[in-house]
């Protein structure tokens, strides 16, 4: 049940992080702005997380974890109230920064906490359940957020997220035990971790592949509507399919990762890259786009969990610091990808985002090949 609480928390944090993707056109319209400009809100959020993850985690390293989580949820809820009331884009952006600060610490400590509260022989499955919560954000959170935004307005979506977060906070207060900070690491852990070349290589891989993914994914909603010219209902269904695929990705991770982590990561990357490269090619074939999005969803979920697990395996002595750097790297990728996508839209056009995102993914795949050969003798775990 305790792992379930963390899974719910992952659900609500991932829902709010990515729900602007589903509401981009509506937010842009309400503020009379272009989607590509509003999309920079995703970049700003991600960069706050990337810059804040490590220093905020270090500042909170000695705080008892349950108390810290309750504080983060309070900040999360208040920021969503401000989002729902935002009277201009800059107020909305400010509210998103509050959420980003909560996000910075939450994802820095959550993976290690889930492993701590899980039964001794169920730690990998517990991490998979955490990832399932993230996937459900794509399955239910994003489509429901879009539906609420269409029926009412986008502000209502943020209000509902704040309400659900309040319920999760109450469950957390009731169910979680006292959780002293353990193996959090200190500032001195950072140079030690940076002397582990495979770990550094994984962090760089995260930045590269996630940049490619979000170059395309940040603008998938306007792409489907404007380039593919599918209806808003089909767009919502495609976002649902993307999230549903994440469940399959979590399942694949649980079954296959332990057998050969390197091959699993490479396989997941191929599933992320190919649909992006072919997105424009098959833009008007509805069933092909559905298939591409499904495979893409499997790939990105599998890849995210696999990379996070690899980081924890390579830094068992400083899990929170390693997770904070992972979260920061991931969000550098998100922010860079959203920025690259905006530049591509302005310079080349919306139709080219898949080509550029896929090309960045290919560079990441070459980098994976390089570090695999370079550190081939590194013990497989």
Protein language model features and the residues they cover:
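Paired small-residue
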Residues: 79-82, 90-98, 287-295
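C-terminal transmembrane helical hairpin of 12-TM major facilitator-type secondary transporters
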Residues: 263-307
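Helix-to-loop junctions at the C-terminal end of transmembrane segments
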Residues: 53-64, 249-261, 345
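Cytoplasmic helix-loop-helix junction between adjacent transmembrane helices
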Residues: 95-133
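Conserved MFS/SLC helix-loop-helix module at the cytosolic interface between two early adjacent transmembrane helices
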Residues: 51-90
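Extracytoplasmic
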Residues: 2-38, 53-56, 216-221
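Helix-breaking motifs and short loop linkers at transmembrane-helix boundaries and internal kinks
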Residues: 32, 64, 85-91, 102, ...
